[in-house]
Amino acid sequence: MLSYLFMISFLIPLCFLYNCWWLIHSLMFLLSFVFMIMFYSYADFNMISYYFGFDYFSFSLILLSFWICSLMITASGSVYLSSYHSNFFVFIILFLLIMLYCSFSSLNLLSFYIFFESSLIPTLLLILGWGYQPERLQAGLYLIFYTLIASLPLLLVLFKVYTVSNTLYFPLLIDFGSYYFMFYVFMFMAFLIKMPMFLVHLWLPKAHVEAPISGSMILAGVLLKLGGYGIFRVMKIISYLGMKFNYFWISLSLCGGVIVSFICFRQVDLKSLIGFSSVAHMSMVIGGLMTMNWWGCMGSFSLMIGHGLCSSGLFCLSNIIYERLGSRSLLINKGMINLMPMMTLWWFLFSSSNMASPPSLNLMGELSLLNSILSWSTFSFLVLIFLSFFSAVYTLYMYSYSQHGSYYMSVYTCSLGYFREYHLLLLHWLPLNILCLKGEYFYI
């Protein structure tokens, strides 16, 4: 598997050759397909080296990273056409892909931590370098400080873990039992902020609103999943305390998900609405992981993959409108069925997937999470009813406001959509719905 890492690394010199944008794009898709074909060879645990290896969970998230990074280049046609440092832009995407590959395949907690934090740097460069408004500086500061405030305590905890157990190697780590309550809090907080959990989520809508399309895609598609993956990995170290105190995180995330759903009703910014809906979906993932049962972990896994494809597709749709009308406001982006009738079909398909209707992967994930959380506490159905219902309400609100009604009077006409854009949307939607037919993949 080290060969894939080398192949990505050798794409970097191509970035600085003249007019190699689409060559790199094609090679990244080729790499994604080759990686996908090799799945059955690496379905079980597989070692790359002493510090690197991956299992079922990390393999799928690496594949998602390959796929989303390839689609980021497809979506960023405007960067290529404007020639605004397009070579450096592709270099950042490849560097980010290497960081994600190393994060998901790390078997050592310290190397996982280093690559986990390193993925922040290229994301920040994407927001600051190719964002649209001057407020992107504030969004970048939010992103850095929210993430780093919880990361320093996590580093100190890792040093203490090494002192106690003399190793940071995942398979050899043991449960610390009833000691070190602060271990439990500090170890979870860095990952919960990354997901993000309600109350520490304010950086996400800001980052989404100010980020270019590529930044929003990788942020919603993969970087949020780093938090869930981290919780999944460290759960066994603190499972004893988790049995006692996880109810707090479950309650907070589920109630927070309902509150965030209400916040979605008040949004008039399209990207902000999709960003807040990510927080609502991730609240169910946190709830499922914290129950620490098989249904919860597998449901979180499938919802993370489904949400990564679905929210990335929705950001692509909002960007397609933004490139034509120059606004993200729902007050201006209305009646789009009159201007772009073919694109309305894609809005409907992604909106229906976002509210977890069949045959999307989100449905499979949400059903598993409902099963998991209800088996943990029957009374949680009171919150889950509202969470599932309002998820459909704000998605339909977004769809109906943006597509129906009279269009903005100052807009006379616009392009119906390029082949590149429809191709991009198809490559998001197809795996999102076809994977539902391969349900056993997520429940081994």
Language-model region placement:
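Core, highly hydrophobic multi-pass alpha-helical transmembrane subunits of bioenergetic inner membranes
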Residues: 1-444
